UniProtKB/Swiss-Prot annotation:
Keyword RNA-binding applies: no
GO MF entries: crossover junction DNA endonuclease activity; DNA binding; magnesium ion binding
Record's function text: The RuvA-RuvB-RuvC complex processes Holliday junction (HJ) DNA during genetic recombination and DNA repair. Endonuclease that resolves HJ intermediates. Cleaves cruciform DNA by making single-stranded nicks across the HJ at symmetrical positions within the homologous arms, yielding a 5'-phosphate and a 3'-hydroxyl group; requires a central core of homology in the junction. The consensus cleavage sequence is 5'-(A/T)TT(C/G)-3'. Cleavage occurs on the 3'-side of the TT dinucleotide at the point of strand exchange.
Quaternary structure and interacting proteins, as annotated: Homodimer which binds Holliday junction (HJ) DNA. The HJ becomes 2-fold symmetrical on binding to RuvC with unstacked arms; it has a different conformation from HJ DNA in complex with RuvA. In the full resolvosome a probable DNA-RuvA(4)-RuvB(12)-RuvC(2) complex forms which resolves the HJ.
Binding residues for Mg(2+) 1: 7, 138
Positions annotated to bind Mg(2+) 2: 66
Natural source organism: Cereibacter sphaeroides (strain ATCC 17029 / ATH 2.4.9)
GO biological process, one term: DNA recombination
EC numbers on record: 3.1.21.10
Pfam families attached to this UniProt entry: RuvC
Designated name of the protein: Crossover junction endodeoxyribonuclease RuvC
UniProt KW keywords: Cytoplasm, DNA damage, DNA recombination, DNA repair, DNA-binding, Endonuclease, Hydrolase, Magnesium, Metal-binding, Nuclease
């Protein structure tokens, strides 16, 4: 299974692709979609195009997006929410199921604690994906989202199998 993880952002939208085979995770690629300052509609269009290119190039089977947090600046929060909409829309347009995870859930899955620092996330992503060259903190976060989704899908599959066995 190939998983695309997305860390939404208006200026820098991180993405990471991993392959999952059983409990084995393998890094495929990671990067950052950038948008320049200026007209919001053009920035969103740019992010849409870049993320669409990532999907076309790497052909993921599923995707996952990190929830955004609300901060004191309402305008910034709304703009971030619009970028997150692009992060949800592009994989959905490609027919993919899209998982959504809170930042604390991602950190808890990858690092072991829900309030981990960026450096801890990057360190643990490197441990999960040996040899990975991270394009930046946003790409590391996106890979962490992909790892979280892979673990969640595996756990859900094991639970469904156990319930099916118990029902027999």
């Amino acid at each position: 299974m190939r998983v695309l993880g997305i860390d939404p952002g208006l200026r820098n939208m991180g993405w990471g692709v991993i392959d999952v085979s059983g409990t084995r995770l393998a890094h495929v690629a990671n990067g950052i979609c950038h948008s320049d300052s200026g007209d919001l509609a053009q920035r969103l269009l740019s992010l849409h195009g870049q993320l669409t290119d990532v999907l076309a190039r790497f052909q993921p089977d599923t995707a996952a997006v990190e929830h955004t947090f609300v901060n004191k600046d309402g305008v910034a929060t709304l703009k971030l929410g619009q970028a997150r909409g692009i992060a949800l829309l592009v994989p959905a347009q490609a027919g993919l199921a899209v998982g959504e995870y809170a930042p604390n859930a991602v950190k808890k899955t990858v690092v072991g604690v829900g309030h981990a620092a960026k450096e801890q996330i990057q360190h643990m992503v490197r441990l999960h994906l040996p040899g990975v060259a991270l394009a930046g903190p946003d790409a590391a976060d996106a890979l962490a989202v992909a790892i979280c989704h892979a673990h969640h899908v595996q756990s859900s599959g094991r639970l469904e199998a156990a319930l099916a066995r118990a029902a027999r």
